[in-house]
Amino acid sequence: MAKRSLGIGKASKAKKQKSAPREEEKIEKDQATEGSNEITVELNEEADANDEIAQLKALWKTYNDSEKDNELVINGIIHECDRLLRNSKLGEEKEKEKEQYTQELPDFFHSIYALALAELAKFHTEDNKKVAEYFDAAVERADLGLSQHQDSIQLLFSKSKILLHQIALQYISQLKVDTSISKKVPKLSSYLDSALRTYEEAEKKADELKKYELFNADQLEILQVLDDLLDIVDNFGKDIAEGEDDDDEVEDDEIELEESHPLYAIRESDEYNQWWRDHIILFLDNVDKHGKEIKVDFKEKAKSQEEEHPLLPLRREICKRIGQSYLQEAEVPSSVFTTLAYDDGFKNEKEINGLSLKESQKIAQKLISTALKYLQWAEDQEEPETWVNVAEAMISLGNLYEVESEEQESHYQEAEKILNKANNVTNGKYEDVLENLLGD
């Protein structure tokens, strides 16, 4: 597809205001001093050259689909948003004089503006004051947009993403292991609850209005941000401990937090991990509702990428993440079963972590079987790695049955077929995995 260049930011300089500027106006001034406002970005032809809002939307998509590592582009987007906002206000004043004002910036304008402001914080993590300013401005812009578009699902999704990023970049980044909750340091579980309530509000409205097309890759990113945030909380303090202790054991040991720590309530509760699981499964259901003709039987493979339902790549990505989450949950009961069944050092033990041999086996088998289902749905005929994910899950499931039992051999044999196929098309990339299975 042919592309063209777009120059933006030529008219972004604003007149000085007598009243105190809002956060986003102060940011506009700061960014104007950091370099030329002239930016050239290639856009797809679908952007109407005469529609500035459409151009902004296309520019944001260009950035959003990139590596997101270009601060200059983000500055340009913010300058353009500011210019469009000022022009809109000027037009509003003129039209109001004629009592004919009907112009209103669309909800996605406010969404782009807010997300761009939050994105800018990622480039200034060394200056927490700036980070706070960017996030305050981002939340303010989202709220202003919602005041004009009260039923905007997109703005609610965007706000929830901003709030999640804010927790990590503005707050967690400043914490230490011995930090305690105070007037200046909030209990972060309440902030996380607020972000998740905002997401749930968007999710509920989308379902009520049957706007299932909104459950796309952009919104899936919100759940990824949450997953990353929970991982940060789980591993909080390990990097500090590793710097102070030369022992490798630190990597596997969780750093204890006092009840007064801002992250304590998040780490000690499993409700947030369960929330993620529940809502990504619901996300998958909504994707399926949008793509009514989508194939969900892993055995029904399209003959080529061109014949695929357009939502299948998204669906595969969701299923992969769900499958991986079940595998992760299965790690503890699987380890308990293996230890009680095969470790002579525990032959007199009846339980580990409150689980007996039979209980741990049953729980792990159920979790890995569920994981296997989703990983099979995540298989891509063009990506051998997705086949190997299935094979490895089959091996893990086989390990939970009696040695040389019919069930174990069945899972191993199926895994071997898959690994041989993957190994052949990748010129031996998975030879080690295959040899490990065969015991060579």
Swiss-Prot record:
Keyword Cytoplasm: no
Pfam family, one: Nro1
Cellular component GO terms held in the UniProt record: nucleus
Localization (cell): Nucleus
InterPro entries tied to this protein: Nro1/ETT1 (IPR024318)
Bias (Basic and acidic residues) ranges: 20-32
Sequence segments annotated as region (Disordered): 1-37
Domain of life: Eukaryota
One annotated GO biological process: regulation of translation
Record keywords, A-Z: Nucleus, Transcription, Transcription regulation, Translation regulation
Function field: Required for correct translation termination and probably involved in regulation of hypoxic gene expression.
Family: Belongs to the ETT1 family.
Protein name as catalogued: Enhancer of translation termination 1
